[in-house]
């Protein structure tokens, strides 16, 4: 089976693969961040959002993987084999978990649309030859809040507002869940 854990969130393994492996913080840092920002929601019996659920699952998977690694470390006699298993877990599985944790924490923190826009922007930046791209990569926290990701195949509506409606003079605020609320 070829399962893409990002598909239901509008992203893909391929889209995240543009980010270099050293881009993602350590699992310890990501777990600390998730705990500091979302502990109450993650430990709650209530369903908060698909991102909270995915984050819970990634954290549980990492815990089980660490239990397995501990068991292997205790029960595998050959030091070379033990080192191979530890290395494989840290390099391959660790990267996948770091990507999952980063994606869902970022979506909860910045909003899914902003994270998707960042992934697309970074993917375009990294594939552009160095001579033709800006020297610095896009930064997630500096993307404008008005970022809109359009679905392929849909053309934007081209309509001016009717003269009867008055437009507010203040800029429109993007609807998103408050960072203060846990869910």
UniProtKB/Swiss-Prot annotation:
Q: Which UniProt keywords apply?
A: Capsid protein, Cytoplasmic inwards viral transport, DNA-binding, Host cytoplasm, Host-virus interaction, Microtubular inwards viral transport, Phosphoprotein, Repeat, RNA-binding, T=4 icosahedral capsid protein, Viral penetration into host nucleus, Virion, Virus entry into host cell
Q: Which GO terms describe its molecular function?
A: DNA binding; RNA binding; structural molecule activity
Region Disordered: list its residue ranges. 136-183
Q: Which InterPro entries match?
A: Hepatitis_core, Viral_capsid_core_dom_sf_HBV
Tell me if Secreted is a UniProt keyword of this record. Answer: no
- Which residues, renumbered to this chain, carry the PTM Phosphoserine? 155, 162, 170
**Subunit comment for this entry?**
Homodimerizes, then multimerizes. Interacts with cytosol exposed regions of viral L glycoprotein present in the reticulum-to-Golgi compartment. Interacts with human FLNB. Phosphorylated form interacts with host importin alpha; this interaction depends on the exposure of the NLS, which itself depends upon genome maturation and/or phosphorylation of the capsid protein. Interacts with host NUP153.
What is the gene name? C
**Compositional bias (Basic residues) spans?**
149-176
Any Gene Ontology biological process:
symbiont entry into host cell
Q: Where is this region: RNA binding?
A: 177-183
**Record protein name field:** Capsid protein
UniProt xrefs under Pfam families: Hepatitis_core (PF00906)
The short sequence motif called Bipartite nuclear localization signal sits at: 158-175
The PTM entry states: Phosphorylated by host SRPK1, SRPK2, and maybe protein kinase C or GAPDH. Phosphorylation is critical for pregenomic RNA packaging. Protein kinase C phosphorylation is stimulated by HBx protein and may play a role in transport of the viral genome to the nucleus at the late step during the viral replication cycle.
Q: Give the intrachain disulfide bonds.
A: none
Q: What are the boundaries of the region 3 X 8 AA repeats of S-P-R-R-R-[PR]-S-Q? A: 155-177
Q: Where in the cell is it found?
A: Virion; Host cytoplasm
Instruction: Provide the primary localization.
Output: virion
What are the sequence repeat spans here? Answer: 155-161, 162-169, 170-177
Q: What does this protein's UniProt record list under function?
A: Self assembles to form an icosahedral capsid. Most capsids appear to be large particles with an icosahedral symmetry of T=4 and consist of 240 copies of capsid protein, though a fraction forms smaller T=3 particles consisting of 180 capsid proteins. Entering capsids are transported along microtubules to the nucleus. Phosphorylation of the capsid is thought to induce exposure of nuclear localization signal in the C-terminal portion of the capsid protein that allows binding to the nuclear pore complex via the importin (karyopherin-) alpha and beta.
What do the Gene Ontology cellular component annotations say? host cell; host cell cytoplasm; T=4 icosahedral viral capsid
**Organism name:** Hepatitis B virus genotype C subtype ayr (isolate Human/Japan/Okamoto/-)
The record's comment on protein family reads: Belongs to the orthohepadnavirus core antigen family.
Per its UniProt record, what SUPFAM superfamilies does this chain match? Hepatitis B viral capsid (hbcag) (SSF47852)
